[in-house]
């Protein structure tokens, strides 16, 4: 995963992540949510520019937002329990999307 992460809500749900080579890559935010159980905020995102018919890899990170709410730092998901919770929320989100 990239060493430095920027989380910016101002660019229409796009975040820019600096990869290992120092290049910035755009990712589109699928959704974000807060967990009271883990006392963290999470964001689910995927590479920007993918078509609706393309299979995409959805990534997840926890994040700490700055005081202004404009940027923040992405952090890795640390435990299996967090992953289980994220997968359950994602499954619910995708099921709701299919119903629409």
Swiss-Prot record:
InterPro entries: UPF0473 (IPR009711). Belongs to the UPF0473 family. This is UPF0473 protein lmo1501. It comes from Listeria monocytogenes serovar 1/2a (strain ATCC BAA-679 / EGD-e). The lineage of its organism: Bacteria, Bacillati, Bacillota, Bacilli, Bacillales.
């Amino acid at each position: 995963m990239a060493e430095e992460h920027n989380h910016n809500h101002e660019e229409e749900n796009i975040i820019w992540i600096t990869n290992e080579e120092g290049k910035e890559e755009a990712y589109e935010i699928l959704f974000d949510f807060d967990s009271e159980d883990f006392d963290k905020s999470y964001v689910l995102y995927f590479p920007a520019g993918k078509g609706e018919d393309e299979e995409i890899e959805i990534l997840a990170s926890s994040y700490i937002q700055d005081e202004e709410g404009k940027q923040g730092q992405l952090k890795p998901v640390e435990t299996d329990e967090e992953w289980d919770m994220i997968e359950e929320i994602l499954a619910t989100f995708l099921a709701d999307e299919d119903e629409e």
